[in-house]
């Protein structure tokens, strides 16, 4: 186990540390919990992990707590959220894939419905039963029928968006697979205000919910799953313009800058190799206009991350004002790696252009990111967000699964450190319950049997540094949409069947080689054989289904809508 002390990167962060009381101060009541989940945030998109984007609020938490550079989640949003909130593998909690991507052959199985089933209990439900106020504001995407909304899964007060994503400026769908953007408040349909901007609104409502009970002695759990930085990537111009010119040298140059900065920050080893994800365009082969548009798309992306961090800062300031900051556990992470879908063309066009025209979206350079625009960074820019890792969202490669994790607050006695201990998304629920001294449900809830937690409680590591969190002989399996991995000690096997067309397993030492530059399959055949056998056991134990021949995720999600658009053309 290796930990690295974070060197304070700016006077502002140093001043924030000096001016704030220690986060671990003892209180007469249980600690509050604030769980902040970014959407499609890449590994080096925050400043503590080597990113150039200004994130002082997250940096403040990192400086006052412990960050994990070897934390892994799922490669797509709903399975990650389901495992985060239940501590149960996605094939057992009902969400092995997003419902929009599930093929018909798999929908015949109860554990392949794409919504939380009744065999799991959420972190919110357990905390609610222990006397916590429970609040959620943001993206849900775990079921939209009344019994599946967050108001029925343990949350007292909610503002929830039910789809894969939505516009950040107004209440409208962002893809033609939806008739409308589906929003709910406390379990009923909700209309957004005219001055809506997602990150601002979520923090406004979180503060409102907390403030409504601030005078009592009950602790609170606030779950804030931002839309940032899921497409459509949108941000107020004042945030995007801060990054004018930053990305003008292109993704190859910026990817290398981030790799070196990540090494300096201590989030990857010094010998981490540079990699080029297959399919990345040659920046120098593009026209000036194409480069200009790609750079602006990334400026808006940076602005959206910056805006999210700014609103997180408002929440931190509010908690200080009511004397709850020092008694609050903060957890910040992302649901999966950066989004690499190629919705927008190099010149600002789109495969969705007919639908854009119908509903009033545009991808114009001059207004990119503002109200009425539709923006995505695309696969080549996504390699910046994932740098120095390989690939991005949906893939089982490190760029899809490895994201930042920052924890601070009572019970997290280690300050200003980065740990390279392996942590998996299902580990967070049992750890949070231990930190607030609430009993694990143990596989039984309200007189019925439910799925037990499968994650490892690492609360003692947060205070005492006891390692390893996972024994080197413990296999941890993963599968989503045919893309598979298994972790064991420092090693990982991976096969991206539907992402890259892999037909053979690759083997990597991801502690020393996080960029997956050196395939060890031929050098360590016995280890590969043992780990593939472990994966087969995982498949059998968790009911993992094979993907049907010819499965294509994009066509499954968008195909019918694109076909309808063609048929509707005059």
Where are these regions (language model features)?
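Gram-negative bacterial Sec-dependent N-terminal signal peptides
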Residues: 2-23
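Long, internal low-complexity/basic segments
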Residues: 26-31, 38, 42-43, 67, ...
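Active-site regions of oxyanion-processing enzymes, predominantly non-cytosolic
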Residues: 28-32, 84, 131, 144-168, ...
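Active-site segment of extracytoplasmic enzymes that catalyze sulfate/phosphate-ester chemistry
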Residues: 43-135, 153, 157, 163, ...
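Active-site rim elements
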Residues: 46-47, 109-117, 189-197, 247-249, ...
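Short, solvent-exposed turn/loop segments enriched in Gly/Ser/Thr/Pro and often Arg
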Residues: 47-53, 67-91, 96-98, 136-148, ...
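Histidine-centered active-site microenvironments of extracellular/periplasmic hydrolases
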Residues: 146-154, 234-235, 317-408, 566-569
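C-terminal cap/loop subdomain of S1 sulfatases and analogous C-terminal strand-loop tails that border
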Residues: 156-157, 161-167, 370-401, 412-510
């Amino acid at each position: 186990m290796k930990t690295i002390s974070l060197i304070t990167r700016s006077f502002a962060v140093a001043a924030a540390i000096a001016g704030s009381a220690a986060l671990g101060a003892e209180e007469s009541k249980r600690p509050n919990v604030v769980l902040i989940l970014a959407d499609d945030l890449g590994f080096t998109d925050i400043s503590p992990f080597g990113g150039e984007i200004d994130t002082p609020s997250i940096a403040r938490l990192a400086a006052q707590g412990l960050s994990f550079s070897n934390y892994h989640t799922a490669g797509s949003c709903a399975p990650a959220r389901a495992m985060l909130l239940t501590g149960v593998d996605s094939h057992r909690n009902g969400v092995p894939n997003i419902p929009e991507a599930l093929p018909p052959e798999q929908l015949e199985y109860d554990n392949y419905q794409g919504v939380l089933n009744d065999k799991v209990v959420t972190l919110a439900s357990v905390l609610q039963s222990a006397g916590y106020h429970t609040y959620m504001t943001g993206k849900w995407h775990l079921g939209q029928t009344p019994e599946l909304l967050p108001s029925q899964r343990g949350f007292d007060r909610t503002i929830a968006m039910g789809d894969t994503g939505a516009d950040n400026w107004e209440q409208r769908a962002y893809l033609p697979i939806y008739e409308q953007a589906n929003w709910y408040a406390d379990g009923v349909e909700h209309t957004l205000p005219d001055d809506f901007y997602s990150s601002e609104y979520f923090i406004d409502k979180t503060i409102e919910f907390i403030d409504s009970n601030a005078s009592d002695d009950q602790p609170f759990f606030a779950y804030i799953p931002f839309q940032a930085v899921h497409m459509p990537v949108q941000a107020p111009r004042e945030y995007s313009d801060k990054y004018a010119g930053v990305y003008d040298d292109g993704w190859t140059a910026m990817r290398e800058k981030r790799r070196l900065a990540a090494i300096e920050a201590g989030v990857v080893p010094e010998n981490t190799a540079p990699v080029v994800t297959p399919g990345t365009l040659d920046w120098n082969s593009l026209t000036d206009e194409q480069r200009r548009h790609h750079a602006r798309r990334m400026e808006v992306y940076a602005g959206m991350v910056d805006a999210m961090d700014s609103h997180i800062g408002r929440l931190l300031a509010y908690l200080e004002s009511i004397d709850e900051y020092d008694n609050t556990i903060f957890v910040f992470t992302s649901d999966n790696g950066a989004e690499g879908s190629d919705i927008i063309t190099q010149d600002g066009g789109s495969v969705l252009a007919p639908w854009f025209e119908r509903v009033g979206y545009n991808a114009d350079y001059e207004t990119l990111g503002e109200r009425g625009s539709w923006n995505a960074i695309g696969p080549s820019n996504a390699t910046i967000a994932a740098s120095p890792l390989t690939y991005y969202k949906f893939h089982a490669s490190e760029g899809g699964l490895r994201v930042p994790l920052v924890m601070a607050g009572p019970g997290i006695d280690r300050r200003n450190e980065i740990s390279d201990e392996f942590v998996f998304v299902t580990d967070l629920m049992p750890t949070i319950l231990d930190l607030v001294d609430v009993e694990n449900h143990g596989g039984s809830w309200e007189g019925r049997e439910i799925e037990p937690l499968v994650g490892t409680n690492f609360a003692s590591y947060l205070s005492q540094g006891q390692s390893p969190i996972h024994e080197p002989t413990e296999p941890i399996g993963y599968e989503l949409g045919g893309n598979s991995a298994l972790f064991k000690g420092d090693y990982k096997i991976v096969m991206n069947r539907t992402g890259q067309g892999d037909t053979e397993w690759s083997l990597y030492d991801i502690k020393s080689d996080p960029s997956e530059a050196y395939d060890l399959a031929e050098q360590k055949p016995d280890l590969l054989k043992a780990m593939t056998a472990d994966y087969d056991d995982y498949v059998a134990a968790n009911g993992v289904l094979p993907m049907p021949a010819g499965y294509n995720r994009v066509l499954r999600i968008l195909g019918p809508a694109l076909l309808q658009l063609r048929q509707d053309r005059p």
